[in-house]
Amino acid sequence: AKESLLFHRFFANARTTARAIFSTITGIPDVNLSSTASRNPLVVDQRVVGNEFTGYDKYYLIGGNTAWANIRSILGQNIQGLRILEEDYWKEPRADVWGVTDYDLLKEADKLFASRDPQHPFLAVIQMASYHSPYTVPKTPGFSESEASQEDLSNYGFESQKEYNSMRYTDFAVGEFIRWAKASGYYHNTIFFIFGDHGLNDKVRNMPRGYVNSRLAPWHTPLIIHAAPELGLITPGESMLPASQVDVFPTAAGLAGIAYNNWTLGRDLFDRRYDGSRQVYIGGKGGEPIHLVDGDYCYLDNRAGELRLFRLSDPTGEDLAAQEPERFARLRQMAEDMDATIRYMLFNNRKSAK
């Protein structure tokens, strides 16, 4: 992370892995009311930024398979020419129900990318799953488990030592992947995005009370963007800009120098035109709370009749709705407008609508 750009306020637009994949690929938050949008035949066809990568070979790599939540259909239906590589493709053995481990998956990915024509560009999504129950951590050269104190586990939202070490294992695997990429050569012309499908539970204690009361932890993940220094694309550091999964593909296209049409809600995080109007919408199925993150503020509609406003860095965690009525009214209206727009776009952004 020290050699990358870390976005501290990056969020999943909706919770569960299937909703995260849909939101990232389509650029529209998955707010399908009952089941996930991936299972809804009326919304699986979308116009996506991924198809603007003309001339790129496209891959989706997963240690297990995509035979769940209709994910295979979402991917194949929306990204033209996509090769989906699953557990049967890999030489490494399965470790658990999620297929091969993150370490082995990334090792296989490195071999694949290293074998390609370096003059031909590629776009790849690698879905890792070792940091997921049952938290399988096999013996791996260079990695050793560590025991955290119970206080640290509680402060950072971990439920067990196994969960904590599986996170460390995935982090180790990603570090090894970057090292392999450098040795293989393609590193020097590749942009890496590292982010999560969703966050931990709501039990974190190491954050300001304003953040805790906003109930953002289940959707909060890091975003790390990394590229070789000689490309001159990334200035290592930290950013507090609000960002979310829908922004990933527009940002990748912008950094890659691709001129693209954007029918989604995602925005290029490096496009300065949007710096004064960056908000993150977080929703989900019916009954899920709605959040709107705007700078250091979070509007929260808990769907139970309570509407609140918090400042994320506020150590008191006080509800500021009454103290800042204009800001509260503005963010409330914006959240309601975005929610209505997203629900419309789910059904009205088909490729056939060009």
How would you name each of these model-derived features?
Residues 1, 24, 122-128, 167-170, ...:
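Beta-strand elements within well-structured catalytic alpha/beta cores of enzymes
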Residues 1-157:
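Active-site-proximal alpha/beta segments of enzymes that process anionic O-linked groups
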Residues 10, 35-40, 95-96, 164, ...:
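Second-shell loop/turn segments in exported
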Residues 19, 93, 216-220, 287:
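Short, solvent-exposed loop/turn segments at the edges of secondary structure
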Residues 40-45, 160, 164-169, 215-219, ...:
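A short beta-strand-to-alpha-helix junction
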Residues 107-110, 114, 146-190:
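A long, amphipathic alpha-helix that forms part
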Residues 182, 187-234:
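Histidine-centered active-site microenvironments of extracellular/periplasmic hydrolases
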Residues 231-354:
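Membrane-interface soluble catalytic domains
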